[in-house]
Each structure stands twice: as structure tokens, then as C-alpha cells.
From Swiss-Prot:
Protein name per UniProt: DNA topoisomerase 1
Any one Gene Ontology BP term: DNA topological change
Species for this entry: Xylella fastidiosa (strain Temecula1 / ATCC 700964)
Reactions catalysed, as given in the entry: ATP-independent breakage of single-stranded DNA, followed by passage and rejoining
Positions with biased composition (Basic and acidic residues): 774-801
Keywords recorded for this protein, A-Z: DNA-binding, Isomerase, Magnesium, Metal-binding, Topoisomerase
Gene label: topA
């Protein structure tokens, strides 16, 4: 019988570690967090020292029971959850549960940590156990309590002032503010025209181009030329001065070193995976988790391929450095090795607990060697980690930049530049990605012919090119993570969840690979920025993260921090609940006056989303409403565009003596004839669709409905229907199966009733077009069903039944 119980978070991790430890250990998984705050008011009690009420997470109850059962017979217990605050908190919760159940009175329980899942790392960790770090647990609990108090108190204000179902998060809200402010910058941006001038030269060795840097004896700036006439005039002056050639006045060569990037931390891994692989932050972390926990490598079994992926550290262990340097010497030559290992310092504003960087557990496992055992995505991410790690310990690349100045007469000067790689160094393995390219990137790899001062170069032609300034780009995932990190907002474990929450809440949409705020997102951000300014302030949020870090280091206590935050926050929430209306909330924009009715026209966030409105609730007549079209926004729609929306519904004409119209409802555009409604296809525009197309869509729907009914039974709600997966029986409440050897159309009512009793399952939706059954028929069918249910209940009554507790729906509480 195993003597020791070791508890980790995931079953994959448990499987890998179990292979290393042998029969003396039982390795079980908690499957993540085992307890969470109860989802109702009072889970955090500020009046009682911020006491926190926890409950077991339903889906993990069985795993807690398995851990409890194993703990009863184990001689000792090791808590081996992840080496960060969340992992420390999970270990603490497990220890509290076992303590409450009286299982720790006569046996030791210790905490062990490791940042890679290898036999050496696991065995070393077991040899160096420690107690649970209360400082890390306090920091995690303070973060959880803050998130709860913000979400539970601020979200209901949004429900009342903006729209029901919204949520506000302590870290999510500043991230949303970043995206919204960037969108406002883009909208406010005024495009400016400017022109550049280039010279195309025909040197005997090769053609090359040079850009104008001096015009009429003055420095050529971006906005020196802003129209085509001025550009054409400058072109003529230069051509006349050049007389078919340019004179070389200066040649300079500069050598510079480009150093390799440090090995990955969480944020840089997410950024590079986004730039180079097109992965979302969520996908990156999911794949990295698999690589960390273990991949089956043939006869070698399950092996952890990378170190822990939630880290702020750029350090590499001495063993890892030695192995990496051996690989470099073997595959790239000793000339690619620096005299001593490269050492990096973190740029992160608040580095957490000391871990290693994200690296391969063994550099000897090259991407090519492990490729047969990995999926395509796993292989691409592993290759990224492997190359970045190896490159970080190689010599710098040496680049040579040549700059040549060429004169056209005495007043005009062009400059040609080119950069070539003299020594590849780390570039032989890896080159860091960029969000935006600059002029230096364009010059890189461009070679120039050998030229000397005093020579003349034949001029082929002078080119002018029109440009327009561009607004700042929207945030990509990589750029947003970088910005969050630079501001000190969030931590390695939260970047992916912040982004996921914004998308899930529909506060932002993805447009290509960039974030675009939705109208709901903008309304929420505007409301919070106007009325809860401090709590979406970047510096305030970053300072709060600093204080949480200080708690994790034992430098501050968590309860004083909670008091300092809670008292003014609660006062502000109570004040705003009573003092604001929806106009103050920033979700209403006045557009002007409707010329027909003379009433006020506004754009606003309504119950079902963005809309426009003619009139107000104070008018005698009820206001009229219209939904916005796709790609329209309440923040940019004009009065004319808004009035156009009220042309819905459009009457297209008549068909089968019934009016046919199109409109836009809660669920999108639709066509209607009589009592038949049909959603328009994505390619159909409700403002341009004609009668023929609308009639076709309606007829198609009615045809499907007609063909759906195989058989009706007189005086019965039961029907034999055609479904997506074949014929079936339904009474509108239950759906039953038809045996494959039975012809559906030949079923009798009694047979159909019996099939419903034997195979019936609750129907998702009642599509029946039949009238409601009479009271007698309903009573008759119900009696039969109840009899069957009673038998079934009696049969299983001796088995334990889990008590179901109905819980009040609580506001969403997010980061």
C-alpha cells in the first residue's frame, strides 16, 4: 500500500509525476481550485475583519472526496500544486478541508514546489519540503476579496444605470479603458497628406533607390510637401539640377551589435505566440500547460517538455545553462558561444516569486526530435520556446549599416541606406517579432553597391509618392498584453483571463486580430471613467498590484489594505446608486430633432443593445425604437442615419393575398407574411431586399414545416415528425425514438404513446403547429406519464439522492 499522498492540480501532471515516484506514492489531482467564495452577498464580510465564506466547487467535490479517502491511509501528505499564489492558495484550501475533517492530527503535511516536471526536480522538491507560505495565501485572498467586492458592488450599479447583466472587474475595467481610449484616438485622428521623393539610380553593379533628405538647401521634413502640385514642381527642380546624375558627397559605414532577446516570461511568450503563430493568449496558455504537464514520448512515457509557464523571471538554472551551451557548441560551433552565459534582468514592473524563465526542460530534446509526438500547434509553440531559449545564450549579431549621400546640384540631397549581417550570432536560430515595422527594418537585408566619395552615379528617374498619415493601430492581443505589463496592471496568471472576460462579456469584438470596443463596452467604460475614475485609473490599479506584491513578500498585512480600499469605495457606490440617471451614465447620446414629428432623437443602450429612439418617456405618445444596423455605433451615427432606421418595417407588397414586409427585431432582420416569420440570410440586406427574395425565403420555411409532419393523430397532441436525425415522436413536451424496423407513417396512437413512455426525453422546443389538446386529453396523457414516473422513482428509491439547493443568481465577479 502506498505510504505517501502527493496532491497536484491536473490529472496530466499527476500521471507524469506518478511515473517518476513509484509505488510508495499515490499522486492525485485536485482539478484546479477546490473551494470558492459562496456566490451570494456576504461572502466577504467587511464588518467582520473581511472574513471569507467558502464552499466546495460542485464539479470538484468527487476529487476532494478521493483526496480525503487517500489521506486517511497515507503516512504523509505532500502538497505539490503550482509554484505561485494561486497554487499556494489551492494547497491552503486542501489543507483546511483535511484539517476540518480531522485527518491531520497524526500525520505530517508539507508543501513542495518545482518549476519543471522532471525526475530530478520532483525528487529534489521532496527532499526540501516547507510549510504553506501564509504570505502568498494572504496575497491571493486579498486579490480574491478585492475582485469580489468590486464585482458584487459595482456590477449592480451598471445594471441599474446602463443595462442589466453587465459586470465590472477590478483589472478588466482598466484594460477595457485602454481599448476604448485607443478607439477614441482613432476616431479623433485627422488624416494629413504628405509626399516623399525618391531617386532611382543605375549603378553598374546594381540598381538602388535613395530618399530625399534635403530640398532647396533645407532639411526635407515629413510635411514639407503636402500636395501634388508642389511635389511635381520639386521633381522638376531636382531633375533640372541633377542633369541625369547624382554626385556622391559622403559614404559612412557603421557597425552595431544586436543582442538576443531574453528567454520567455509569460507576457513575452504570449506576445510572440500572437505575432509569430497567430495564437490567442488563451490558446498559448492552454498549449503551454500541456507541454508543462507532460507529453507521451513513445517508450519514454509522459515527459514535461517546458518549465512552468506563469513567471516573471528571466533566469535560467545552472544545469539548464550548461546544457544549452553544449547544444550551441555542438550545432552552431564554439564561435557562437559567448565567453560566459548571458545574464538578463526582468523588465517587469513587479516581478513575483522567483521562478525560472519559460524554457525547455532539456535543450537536448530538439523540436525535430519531439515533433512525431506533438500536435502541429504543440510543436510550433515548443519550437518557439526552444529557439528563443537557445538564442538567448548566443553571441550578438553584428550588423553593418552603409549610408551614402548623393547630391543633385548644390541644393538637393538624397540618402541611400543598406544593412547587412556581418556575423549572424543568435540570428542563426531566432529573431524576435515586432508589432510595427520601422525604416530600419526596411533597410535590413538591403545591399548597396560599393561606392566612393566623389563618384557620380547615373540617375534613372525621380519618383514622387503620395502618403497619408495613419491613426494609431488598434490593440492586438500581443500589444495589449505588452501595455498591461508596462503599466503594471495584472500578473502572468491574469492576462489571458482579462482578455477572455472582455470578449465573453461582448465588451470588445475581434476585428481581424485587433480589438474593437462594442457600444456596450464603450458605455461601460465611459460610465466607470466618469463616475468611478480612481478605480479604472492605470496608476491606481498598478499601485494596488504593488501592494498585493508587498503582501506576498510579507512586507504588508492584507486586512489594512482591504480597509483602505473598501471604506471610500463603498461610500462612492452608495452615492452613485442614488444620484445618477441613465443620461448621466453616458449611454444616451442626443442626435437632434426629427423633422416629421418635431421630437427628440437619441442613440442609446437599450434593454436588448444599441438602438435609436424618437421621443421620450415623458411624451404623451410612446417613444419609437429602432435597432442599429451591423457596423453602426451609437457614438458615431448621425441624425439622418438614425431617421433612416425608422423606415422599418418595409412593406414589399402582397403575396397570396397577404402583406409581405421586412423588419429588424431583437434577433436580427426578418421577413414576414401573415403569421410566418423567417430570419434573413447573412447576404440579405433588409433595406434592399425585394418581394421575390422575401417570398422565396418564406416559402422555403413553410415547405420545411409541411414536410416535417409525417403523421397526425385525431384528438391528440402526439405527432410523428421528421427531424434532423430522422423520424421521431413528440407531444410537444417529450420526444421519443422510433425503432429502425418500424415504418413511421404506420404507427398507431397507442404505439406512439407507448414509445413516448419508454423512450421519451424532454423536448428542447415545441415546434408543433397543432392547437392545444383538450383538458380531458391532457389529463389522460398526464396520468399515464405520472404512473410511469412513479414506477421509476420506486425502483431507484434505495439509492442516495444528492440534495439540490436553489441558489440566488449573483452578479458576475471578474478580474
Amino acid at each position: 500500500m502506498p505510504k505517501h499522498l502527493l496532491i497536484v492540480e491536473s490529472p496530466a501532471k499527476a500521471k507524469t509525476i506518478n511515473k517518476y515516484l513509484g509505488k510508495d506514492f499515490t499522486v492525485l489531482a485536485s482539478y484546479g481550485h477546490v473551494r470558492d467564495l459562496v456566490p451570494k452577498e456576504g461572502a466577504v464580510d467587511p464588518e467582520n475583519g473581511f472574513a471569507m465564506r467558502y464552499d466546495l466547487i460542485d464539479k470538484n467535490e468527487k476529487h476532494v472526496e478521493a483526496i480525503t479517502k487517500a489521506a486517511k491511509t497515507a503516512d504523509s501528505i505532500y502538497l505539490a500544486t503550482d509554484p505561485d499564489r494561486e497554487g499556494e492558495a489551492i494547497s491552503w484550501h486542501i489543507s483546511e478541508i483535511l484539517k476540518e475533517r480531522g485527518l491531520l492530527k497524526d500525520k505530517p503535511m508539507q508543501r513542495i514546489v518545482f518549476t519543471e516536471i522532471t525526475p530530478r526536480a520532483i525528487k529534489e522538491a521532496i527532499q526540501k519540503p516547507r510549510m504553506i507560505a501564509s504570505d502568498l495565501v494572504d496575497a491571493q485572498q486579498a486579490r480574491r476579496a478585492l475582485d469580489y467586492l468590486v464585482g458584487f458592488n459595482l456590477s449592480p450599479v451598471l445594471w441599474r444605470k446602463v443595462q442589466r447583466g453587465l459586470s465590472a472587474g477590478r483589472v478588466q475595467s482598466p484594460a477595457l479603458r485602454m481599448i476604448v481610449e485607443r478607439e477614441e484616438e482613432i476616431e479623433a485622428f485627422i488624416t494629413r497628406e504628405y509626399w516623399s521623393i525618391h531617386a532611382e539610380c543605375t549603378h553598374p553593379a546594381q540598381h538602388f533607390s535613395a530618399k530625399l533628405i534635403k530640398l532647396d538647401g533645407k532639411k526635407f521634413e515629413q510635411f514639407t510637401i503636402t500636395d501634388s502640385d508642389t511635389a511635381a514642381a520639386a521633381q522638376r527642380r531636382i531633375q533640372q539640377a541633377a542633369q541625369g546624375r547624382l554626385h556622391i558627397t559622403d559614404v559612412t559605414n557603421k557597425e552595431r551589435k544586436r543582442r538576443p532577446a531574453p528567454p520567455f516570461i509569460t507576457s513575452t511568450l504570449q506576445q510572440e505566440a500572437s505575432r509569430k503563430l497567430g495564437f490567442t493568449t488563451r490558446k498559448t496558455m492552454q498549449i503551454a500547460q500541456k507541454l508543462y504537464e507532460g507529453i507521451a514520448l513513445g517508450e519514454e512515457g509522459s515527459v514535461g517538455l517546458i518549465t512552468y509557464m506563469r513567471t516573471d523571471s528571466v533566469n535560467l538554472s545552472l544545469d539548464a545553462l550548461s546544457e544549452i551551451r553544449d547544444i550551441i557548441a555542438r550545432d552552431y560551433g564554439t564561435n557562437a558561444l559567448p565567453d560566459k552565459p548571458n545574464v538578463y534582468t526582468t523588465k517587469s514592473k513587479n516581478a513575483q516569486e522567483a521562478h525560472e524563465a519559460v524554457r525547455p526542460t532539456s535543450a537536448l530534446r530538439t523540436p525535430t526530435q519531439v515533433a512525431p509526438y506533438l500536435s502541429n500547434e504543440e510543436h510550433r509553440l515548443y519550437e518557439l520556446v526552444w529557439k528563443r531559449t537557445v538564442a538567448s545564450q548566443m553571441i550578438p549579431a553584428i550588423l553593418n549599416t552603409t549610408s551614402v549621400d548623393l547630391a543633385a546640384g548644390n541644393e538637393h540631397v538624397f540618402r541611400a541606406t543598406g544593412t547587412t549581417v556581418v556575423v549572424q550570432g543568435f540570428l542563426a536560430v531566432y529573431e524576435e517579432g515586432k508589432d510595427n515595422k520601422n525604416a530600419e527594418d526596411d533597410d535590413e537585408g538591403r545591399k548597396l553597391p560599393v561606392m566612393k566619395t566623389g563618384e557620380n552615379v547615373p540617375l534613372e528617374r525621380i519618383l514622387t509618392e503620395q502618403h497619408f498619415t495613419q491613426p494609431p493601430p488598434r490593440y492586438t492581443e500581443a500589444a495589449l498584453v505588452k501595455a498591461l505589463e508596462e503599466y503594471g496592471i495584472g500578473r502572468p496568471s491574469t492576462y489571458a483571463s482579462i482578455i477572455q472576460t472582455l470578449l465573453f462579456r461582448k465588451y470588445v469584438d475581434m476585428e481581424g486580430r485587433s480589438f474593437r470596443p462594442t457600444d456596450i463596452g464603450r458605455a461601460v467604460s465611459k460610465f466607470l471613467s466618469s463616475h468611478f475614475t480612481q478605480y479604472v485609473d492605470y496608476d491606481f490599479t498598478a499601485h494596488l498590484e504593488d501592494e498585493l506584491d508587498a503582501i506576498s513578500r510579507g512586507e504588508e498585512e492584507w486586512i489594512p489594505l482591504m480597509k483602505k480600499f473598501w471604506v471610500p469605495f463603498k461610500e462612492l457606490v452608495e452615492d452613485k446608486k442614488d444620484s445618477l440617471d441613465k443620461t448621466d451614465a453616458g449611454s444616451v447620446r442626443l442626435l437632434g430633432i426629427d423633422p416629421t414629428s418635431g421630437k427628440e432623437v437619441s442613440a442609446r443602450i437599450g434593454r436588448f443593445g444599441p438602438m435609436v429612439q424618437i421621443g421620450t418617456v415623458d411624451d404623451e405618445e410612446k417613444p419609437r425604437f429602432a435597432s442599429l444596423r451591423p457596423n453602426q455605433s451609437i457614438y458615431s451615427i448621425s441624425l439622418e442615419e438614425a431617421i433612416e432606421l425608422f423606415k422599418m418595417p418595409r412593406v414589399l407588397g402582397e403575396d397570396q393575398s397577404q402583406q409581405v414586409s421586412v423588419g429588424i427585431g431583437r434577433f436580427g432582420p426578418f421577413a414576414k407574411r401573415g403569421s410566418t416569420y423567417v430570419s434573413l440570410k447573412s447576404e440579405d440586406d433588409p433595406y434592399t431586399i425585394d418581394l421575390a427574395r422575401a417570398t422565396l425565403l418564406i416559402n422555403e420555411k413553410e415547405e420545411i414545416a409541411r414536410n416535417r409532419i409525417i403523421k397526425d393523430f385525431e384528438n391528440s397532441q402526439i405527432q410523428v415528425l421528421n427531424g434532423r436525425f430522422g423520424p421521431y415522436i413528440s407531444d410537444g413536451k417529450l420526444n421519443g425514438k422510433i425503432p429502425k424496423d418500424r415504418e413511421p407513417a404506420s404507427l398507431t396512437l397507442e404505439e406512439a404513446q407507448q414509445l413516448l413512455i419508454n423512450t421519451g426525453k424532454p423536448a428542447r422546443k415545441n415546434f408543433s403547429t397543432k392547437k392545444t389538446a383538450t383538458k380531458n386529453e391532457t389529463r389522460k396523457q398526464t396520468t399515464k406519464k405520472r404512473t410511469t414516473d412513479a414506477k421509476a422513482t420506486k425502483k431507484v428509491s434505495d439509492k442516495p439522492v444528492k440534495k439540490q439547493i436553489k441558489k440566488r443568481i449573483a452578479p458576475n465577479i471578474t478580474q
